[in-house]
Amino acid sequence: HVNASGMVNYKDFLKDKAELDTYLKTLSDNPPQPSWTSNEQKAYWINAYNAFTVSLILMHYPVKSIKDIAGKIYKINTAWDIQFINIGGKKYDLNNIEHGMLRRKFNDPRIHFAIVCASMSCAKLRREAYLPAKLDAQLDEAGKDFLNDKPKNRISGGKAKRRERGAG
């Protein structure tokens, strides 16, 4: 339910929500292990982040913006702070995965181009999972795609301008 431009058709995704739920359960029941390689762990967390982001939108569908979700939940500042993710018996929110697991543990700036925040300003959702064996190539490609996306990155008067996260 992702087109070639990385746009997600959430309405159609709802029809196959059972498949997504099965995938999320597989992720939840099989957390990364210390014996896994760095690329195996990184791919796992990127895929988990993206799948749970789609799931969050579907839980609140129809929703105009991911930013509208947090306002529905008492004492939650943003959608990224909702602890709805269970991995290996531990609760996470999207911020935990993005900042606590991905950015802190792997220190790879290309992660920014791989994780989706369900808005026009963010990286596009790939039509395939991130795989350990080709993760570096996938991350490089995601970075090139993002940086070459003119609506997301504009240079005006010699200054770079980016859309804000969660914008449009």
Regions found by a protein language model. Name each.
Residues 1-168:
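Interaction/scaffold regions that mediate signaling and macromolecular assembly across diverse proteins
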